[in-house]
Swiss-Prot record:
Lineage: Bacteria, Pseudomonadati, Pseudomonadota, Betaproteobacteria, Burkholderiales
Name by which UniProt lists this protein: ATP-dependent protease subunit HslV
InterPro entries: ATP-dep_Prtase_HsIV_su, Ntn_hydrolases_N, Proteasome_sua/b, Proteasome_suB-type
Biological function: Protease subunit of a proteasome-like degradation complex believed to be a general protein degrading machinery.
Residues the record marks as active site: 7
GO CC entries: HslUV protease complex; proteasome core complex
Main location (coarse class): cytoplasm
Binding partners and assembly: A double ring-shaped homohexamer of HslV is capped on each side by a ring-shaped HslU homohexamer. The assembly of the HslU/HslV complex is dependent on binding of ATP.
Record EC number: 3.4.25.2
NCBIfam families attached to this UniProt entry: ATP_dep_HslV, PRK05456.1
Positions contributing to Na(+) binding: 162, 165, 168
Keywords: Allosteric enzyme, Cytoplasm, Hydrolase, Metal-binding, Protease, Sodium, Threonine protease
EC top class named in words: hydrolase
Length: 178
């Protein structure tokens, strides 16, 4: 059975502002199944933004578990991510899940990988998914050479990734915390 896959999620933090965005394409093999999926959401009473890439069912399963960890740890993003990563590494079912998450709140951005790693991105910029490398390179160039806001950088980075990656489209969802 082929997996649903392919997306681009990118986050940019600049000063006290952070933006997280993703495209809307869901692909099964070489077929576009949906063009308007929402892979970026707000959780924990709107205080945390999450974007996911990978197998759709796997990503939703991880998102549910992450939200439960946030509730358990009163919104402490780092603690919730580390606890999810611990579960991911020790639970046999979770280890089979093929997904990645970017989570951001007012002060912290984290990447939670399919290996159960929790990464604090360097320079406040990170991206995941099939178009992640394109989006991250574009975001870094824009952040280093312009005064654009995080939202504008995310928007332009997703546009560039959508032009280059066949698994990324131009239907974007972007959330911000200021």
């Amino acid at each position: 059975m082929e997996q649903f896959h392919g997306t681009t999620i990118v986050s940019v933090r600049r000063g006290d502002k952070v933006a997280l965005g993703g495209d809307g394409q869901v692909t099964l093999g070489n077929i576009v199944m949906k063009g308007g999926a929402k892979k970026v959401r707000r959780i924990y009473n709107g205080k945390v933004m999450v974007g996911f890439a990978g197998g759709t069912a796997d990503a939703f399963s991880l998102l549910d578990r992450f939200e439960a960890k946030l509730e358990k740890h009163q919104g402490n993003l780092t603690r919730a991510a580390v606890e999810l990563a611990k579960d991911w590494r020790t639970d046999r079912m979770l280890r089979r899940l093929e997904a990645m998450l970017i989570a951001a709140d007012a002060t912290t951005t984290l990447v939670i990988t399919g290996n159960g790693d929790v990464l604090d991105p360097e320079g406040g910029i990170c991206a995941i998914g099939s178009g992640g490398a394109y989006a991250q390179a574009a975001a870094k160039a824009l952040a280093d050479n312009t005064e654009l806001s995080p939202r504008e950088i995310v928007e332009k980075s997703l546009e560039i990734a959508g032009d280059m990656c066949i698994y990324t489209n131009h239907n974007r969802v972007i959330e911000t915390i200021e």
